[in-house]
Amino acid sequence: MARHGGGRGWYGKVVGAALGVTMLAVGASVWTAQADSVGGGPASEASASAAPGGAAEAVDVSIAHASDAGPRGVNITIDDGPDPAWTPQVLDLLDEYGAKATFCMTGVQAEAHPDLVKDVVAAGHRLCDHSVSHDTGMDKKSEAYQSKEILDAERMIIKASGGVRPMYYRAPGGAFTPYSRKLAASHGMRPLGWNVDTKDFERPGTNAIVATVQRELANGPTILFHDAGGDRTQTVEALRQVLPWLKEQGYAFGFPVR
């Protein structure tokens, strides 16, 4: 869970379709990231989230931050699970407040808890590949290693879900490389960043997690939480406050653009 600064506020632009790689410009995380949307609204994307099996269509290699729900959209993203102690509680809260989320699962956890993966899919949420082992040093490893971590996790998640593909790839700790982004995109998984790192994995207290969301939401729409990797009581309680607050502020729950 270290190195979380790596995926925050990266707004990549594709430069050279023939090469299929991008140059990353590290800039301020702002709502103008909505301009990075590569087509498709909530209706068209919702149907894609449940598409089982088959070959995946390639997607944009740039790191997504924007929401398909428009300028007042927010993306709830949940990392490192699923976990039987916490994922069901998170799912219950999302259902209570009519929120959708993107679950970035490790292959190990998905393989261990296929019932929870299926529960996530059945509730209308989206799946995201978070590598097999959550190695935050992946960007320093060989391309063969990166490929194995990403593609093995993809297979494990698809099997656990009963055939539903992950729609995104989030590098552990934001440890993306041009190679990993291109590989993921070629398998239909849009590289996924974040704008608000709640740092809930540090267990700073429920109030601190909530305050971080309220303070940093102006940075952009994609909010990072965790449902595994330790005691997530504070995360659950923070979501219990954050989800209704977002609705009261007029935000709509969406998914990251693809």
List the predicted regions and their residue ranges:
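N-terminal export and membrane-targeting signals
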Residues: 1-20
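Soluble non-cytosolic domains of exported or imported proteins
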Residues: 81-88, 111, 144-147, 174, ...
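His/Asp/Glu-enriched short active-site or ligand-binding loop at hydrolase and phosphoryl-transfer sites
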Residues: 175-216, 250-258
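Active-site beta->alpha N-cap acidic-glycine motif
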Residues: 52-141, 152, 156, 166
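C-terminal domain-boundary segment and adjacent tail
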Residues: 59-70, 97, 110-111, 233-258
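N-terminal low-complexity, Pro/Thr-rich disordered segments
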Residues: 27-69
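CE4/NodB-like, metal-dependent polysaccharide N-deacetylase domain
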Residues: 91-104, 126, 143-174, 182, ...
